[in-house]
Amino acid sequence: MDRVFLLLSVLSLGVSSQPITDSQRLFSIAVSRVQHLHLLAQRLFSDFESSLQTEEQRQLNKIFLQDFCNSDYIISPIDKHETQRSSVLKLLSISYRLVESWEFPSRSLSGGSAPRNQISPKLSELKTGIHLLIRANQDGDEMFADSSALQLAPYGNYYQSLGADESLRRSYELLACFKKDMHKVETYLTVAKCRLSPEANCTL
């Protein structure tokens, strides 16, 4: 982790002299980080689902499809076409807010295993990297708005004392939303990174 922060610091110092090269390197680190988090989210969700009875899975999936994730309050592209039309800075800004929205909820995902305990620190590393990318890709026409004032509603009553059935639902919801959001961030960062390679085909 120290090596990652050192590299991020070095790259941030060189942004003004070699913006394209530095952005490429930062993007590679960020994409690698979010890919790891997305795979981890998929595994945690799969493990949780496998511990449920078939009827429990069916009911929870039905409820989740009718519910909303906390991050749905963050405006993002509605489909792959809008994603491809979005600017690099817009994709980075949305990714930053999505990652930031998990800083507190991720604590409830930690504990019990080494992979779970990696979630919060890796989210913090990813947020730092995306912030450096935003700084490197800002221009006078398009500026990143600070999201520090952005307040999202909590995940229902997830943090309260719940009955067994409700606790099961909240755990399912949290893991499903985390997987969904990490998939979004991976998609946005991958498309944004591709934009820096004019010869590349960025079709989703």
From Swiss-Prot:
Cystine connections: C69-C177, C194-C202
Signal peptide: 1-17
Keywords: Disulfide bond, Hormone, Metal-binding, Pyrrolidone carboxylic acid, Secreted, Signal, Zinc
Domain of life from the UniProt record: Eukaryota
Xref: Gene3D superfamilies: 1.20.1250.10
Biological process terms in GO annotation: animal organ development; growth hormone receptor signaling pathway; positive regulation of growth; positive regulation of receptor signaling pathway via JAK-STAT; response to nutrient levels
Major localization listed first in the record, in broad terms: secreted
Binding site for Zn(2+): H36, E186
Cellular-component GO terms for this entry: extracellular space
Cellular localization per UniProt: Secreted
One Gene Ontology term of the molecular function aspect: metal ion binding
InterPro entries hit by this protein: 4_helix_cytokine-like_core (IPR009079), Somatotropin (IPR034975), Somatotropin/Prolactin (IPR001400), Somatotropin_CS (IPR018116)
Chain positions found as Pyrrolidone carboxylic acid: Q18
Function noted in UniProt: Growth hormone plays an important role in growth control and is involved in the regulation of several anabolic processes. Implicated as an osmoregulatory substance important for seawater adaptation.
Record PANTHER family: SOMATOTROPIN, SOMATOTROPIN,PROLACTIN
Family per similarity comment: Belongs to the somatotropin/prolactin family.
Name used for this protein in its record: Somatotropin
Species of origin: Thunnus thynnus
The encoding gene: gh
